[in-house]
């Protein structure tokens, strides 16, 4: 029985022998461009189910993977994709760990390839590489959105320029700080923000400020900026922006170059208190503050031969409404109100009788009227004509109906016509218990 060879296996054996005998020393997996296309694998006549046919067809269906040449020859032609650029090992590891972050290797490659004469470009690249290494890169896109739902605290910073160029002679720093820094402390407590004065000219010692500015310390980097007020707020977004607006509105009041406003006047008064200036005396009747107040009265001269000042109270002179010593006091009449500050009258003499206040009518006063005494009939004759004229009227008839004549005769004894013949001063009050001629005689 004649044995037939497979053409595919024959081609594989011939290519293996040619590769092994390649004088260029190329890798066995690298093959040169063939002179004619390789024929397709054919199945054996036995249906491909035999072990011999399957073993011979497997090398053609599954060829070994092609690898990039380590050191290809000059005449070798590689079939496949273009070779990838060579990268440093550290950059390759970073690219494998973070495939999305390709910005840092590119910056480092550009910095290495850049000429050192480009100083500004080298400085900018160094700053950018440092930011990326610290993890501060590409955060600007994330900060464009405010998260109001989570209520996370945020920090706001604003720099308010002080108009020293427009008003170079005005001391804005002293007005904002205040005496011993008390003004800016109260301003921070009122607004709830951190406020500080920074920039060129913010320090009192100019020599020290210049020394710190040239020192290059990042803490004093603000000395290279213009004079400004730095406002810093920390809190939830809504509250932080509200506090910032309030703080900026209050700081704006201190940027007015006016030495006579309320802020400067309060600072002058506070400075006088801190320096130990005594406060104006506070006595009775002496006004301390306020515009338009009357000046204090001059001192009263003392000594013999000097008269009292106008409107002054002299000891021993009667005051309006007061009782003079030795004057007659009428019983039943309340004394006039006394003047505040006037000396009280003394009632130790025998001519003045002390009367209790307010006067109460005593029951013994009715005993002086003498109801048992008889009165003269002179006054009844005067009323007789009036009674006869009004008797016909119903009004007076009803009042007089059923009464006796004796009730009118009892009042007829009173001499009304001769009681007050003229307007004269009433007589002095008689001694208690004496007989009166008339019950109303004292009037």
From Swiss-Prot:
Glycyl lysine isopeptide (Lys-Gly) (interchain with G-Cter in SUMO2) crosslink site(s): 96, 102, 139, 175, 432
Give the residue ranges for region: Interaction with ZBTB7A: 400-420
Chain positions covered by the region annotation Involved in homodimerization: 100-260
Q: List where Low complexity composition bias occurs.
A: 81-95, 283-293, 307-316
GO CC, one annotated term: membrane
The record's annotation in SMART domains points to: KH (SM00322)
Positions with biased composition (Pro residues): 61-72
Q: Which residues carry this modification: Dimethylated arginine?
A: 320, 331, 340
Could you provide one GO biological process annotation from this protein's UniProt record?
regulation of RNA splicing
Domain (KH): residue spans on this chain: 171-197
Q: Where is this region: Disordered?
A: 1-95, 280-317, 326-345, 411-443
Span of the signal peptide: none
According to the UniProt entry, which residues carry Phosphotyrosine?
387, 435, 440, 443
Asymmetric dimethylarginine PTM positions? 45, 52, 304, 331
The compartments listed are: Nucleus; Cytoplasm; Membrane
The UniProt entry, under InterPro entries, shows: BBP-like (IPR045071), KH_1_KHDC4/BBP-like (IPR055256), KH_dom (IPR004087), KH_dom_type_1_sf (IPR036612), Qua1_dom (IPR032571), Sam68-YY (IPR032335)
Assigned keywords, A-Z = Acetylation, Cell cycle, Cytoplasm, Isopeptide bond, Membrane, Methylation, mRNA processing, Nucleus, Phosphoprotein, RNA-binding, SH3-binding, Transcription, Transcription regulation, Ubl conjugation
Q: Which residues carry this modification: Phosphoserine?
A: 18, 20, 29, 58, 113, 150, 390
* Residues the record lists as Phosphothreonine modifications: 33, 84, 183
Q: Which GO terms describe its molecular function?
A: identical protein binding; molecular function inhibitor activity; mRNA binding; poly(A) binding; poly(U) RNA binding; protein domain specific binding; protein tyrosine kinase binding; protein-containing complex binding
Where do the record's region annotations for Interaction with HNRNPA1 lie? 351-443
N6-acetyllysine: residues bearing it:
21, 175
Q: Subunit comment for this entry?
A: Self-associates to form homooligomers when bound to RNA, oligomerization appears to be limited when binding to proteins. Interacts with KHDRBS3/SLIM-2. Forms a trimeric complex in the nucleus consisting of BANP, HDAC6 and KHDRBS1/SAM68; HDAC6 keeps KHDRBS1 in a deacetylated state which inhibits the inclusion of CD44 alternate exons. The complex is disrupted by MAPK1/MAPK3-mediated phosphorylation of BANP which results in BANP export to the cytoplasm. This facilitates acetylation of KHDRBS1 and CD44 variant exon inclusion.
Into which family does the record put it? Belongs to the KHDRBS family.
Q: What does the record's free text say on domains?
A: The KH domain is required for binding to RNA.
Q: What is this protein called?
A: KH domain-containing, RNA-binding, signal transduction-associated protein 1
Give the organism the record lists.
Answer: Rattus norvegicus (Rat)
